[in-house]
Amino acid sequence: MVADNSTSDPHAPGPQLSVTDIVVITVYFALNVAVGIWSSCRASRNTVSGYFLAGRDMTWWPIGASLFGSSEGSGLFIGLAGSGAAGGLAVAGFDWNATYVLLALAWVFGAIYISSEIVTLAEYIQKRFGGQRIRMYLSVLSLLLSVFTKISLDLYAGALFVHICLGWNFYLSTILTLTITALYTITGGLVAVIYTDALQTLIMVVGAVILAIKAFHQIDGYGQMEAAYARAIPSRTVANTTCHLPRADAMHMFRDPYTGDLPWTGMTFGLTIMATWYWCTDQVIVQRSLSARNLNHAKAGSILASYLKMLPMGLMIMPGMISRALFPDEVGCVVPSECLRACGAEIGCSNIAYPKLVMELMPVGLRGLMIAVMMPALMSSLSSIFNSSSTLFTMDIWRRLRPCASERELLLVGRLVIVVLIGVSVAWIPVLQGSNGGQLFIYMQSVTSSLAPPVTAVFTLGIFWQRANEQGAFWGLLAGLAVGATRLVLEFLHPAPPCGAADTRPAVLSQLHYLHFAVALFVLTGAVAVGGSLLTPPPRRHQIENLTWWTLTRDLSLGAKAGDGQTPQRYTFWARVCGFNAILLMCVNIFFYAYFA
């Protein structure tokens, strides 16, 4: 039964793009291509190190901007606003938690990776444990995760934004974006990716600030946001249910460990495990730190990215909540027929929160600017995935199949891999059109919680426990994969019920939150890996030199690039500056957590 209290049509056509908006979008794309071509021309593209790691000569500010831009692709840009609209502030924990893990990347994981002189993280695993089976396992797993979660999420979210704001053909707009992104990624390698990421990050932040100011103005400021959100109830609801009501704990970060949608226990422990995989062991992210001129530049880049990661609360999540307050019949819909009219999906439309704000609140010209914010977010994330996936396949799989391959062949294969990824991505579009944006975001998180914890466990043991060996790590990964894959299959067979329906899923799904499952999977993998390592011979000292935290012997003070002008005194000074900023950053982070607790 549906209750209907509506008095007007919530689906009346919204504002359309003007000529000025189109001009702004065109100018942005021209600028983006120009920066890509410029950085490609100045890049050392004819060597493997130059193409895949930017010649190990990147400075801190483009690294930090690229880290932020790569993590805030259009999938998360729209997803964070949508999650804010659906459940409130707690989703900001996915960004704020990154502060500590990014510092761990720079001070711990990055030091190990740079000292081991690796190009890919699978290469590090091969050096640390020996053999090839773990390296191949991680390379294939990373490629699959990139294609079926990262590219999928970004493509769907980007296409959703383009469809709502521009009305362009779904396939045409997606293929055009993929083509432009792949063009500068193929030609320029990591240098082009990092510099265009830096440009796109600047545009993202400026545009998001403007929209956030406009959104807060609509509700008379931050002080009115809680009350406005609490009143965001759609006119048509499902009788005898409460799913149309905004959450009572919407303004709190820490939520009940049993009944909360994002329990504080899971957000503290489970999310940290997943974030460690993403920021410290995922090729897409770590590749930026590996390109640093020296360790200080890697540290400063992580600090800059951490400061930027504090922004999504005010620039994406709160505007998402405001969008629901302003447009409850569309963003907050619960009746399947109403949701289908609003966004083409029956189980909810929270993911249209951000593009709805853009089209309704932004004036002529600025509306085009905001579209030029979302498109670079999509392109930034896709370019990162293309480049890193190309690196993985070329360096870890192709070079294994053809050990005598020349540098020219490796570079050609790397570029061809990007073309193949484009084809797979386009073929995946029909699947994305049949999926709900919210379901896709939850699916991505579930996949991460089911597949990432074993990788985090093995990397953590490999870096901090000298006794860990290949046999223990391999069997730990297999055990974790078996358990994680089982949960994924169950989730696919038993999707979450819609509003008003009984939850008949198995207890492992209905009673065990995916963030809590991540903790259990991490512990299981670690236990198997430790047991297997203790039952087999330990690695010898020379096998783990410069590969664990306790066996570092290489002096990193003069950087990864010879002749970069660093002196020990200058290096020490900037190391102290980085250390001070890291402490300040953690204090700021703790303050915000406490304020919104």
Curated annotation (Swiss-Prot):
One of its GO terms (molecular function) is fructose:sodium symporter activity. It comes from the Eukaryota. Its main location: membrane. The chain crosses the membrane at residues 17-37, 74-94, 101-121, 138-158, 172-194, 201-219, 266-286, 302-322, 368-390, 411-431, 445-465, 473-493, 515-535, 577-597. GO terms for cellular component: apical plasma membrane. Keywords: Cell membrane, Glycoprotein, Ion transport, Membrane, Phosphoprotein, Sodium, Sodium transport, Sugar transport, Transmembrane, Transmembrane helix, Transport. It catalyses: D-mannose(out) + Na(+)(out) = D-mannose(in) + Na(+)(in); D-fructopyranose(out) + Na(+)(out) = D-fructopyranose(in) + Na(+)(in). Glycans are attached at residue 5. The modification Phosphoserine is found at residue 49. It is found in: Apical cell membrane. Residues 1-16, 95-100, 159-171, 220-265, 323-367, 432-444, 494-514 are extracellular. Residues 38-73, 122-137, 195-200, 287-301, 391-410, 466-472, 536-576 are cytoplasmic. Expressed only in kidney. Electrogenic Na+-coupled sugar symporter that actively transports D-mannose or D-fructose at the plasma membrane, with a Na+ to sugar coupling ratio of 1:1. Transporter activity is driven by a transmembrane Na+ electrochemical gradient set by the Na+/K+ pump. Exclusively recognizes sugar substrates having a pyranose ring with an axial hydroxyl group on carbon 2. Has likely evolved to enable renal reabsorption of D-mannose, an important constituent of oligosaccharide chains of glycoproteins. Belongs to the sodium:solute symporter (SSF) (TC 2.A.21) family. PANTHER family: SODIUM_MANNOSE COTRANSPORTER SLC5A10, SOLUTE CARRIER FAMILY 5. This is Sodium/mannose cotransporter SLC5A10.
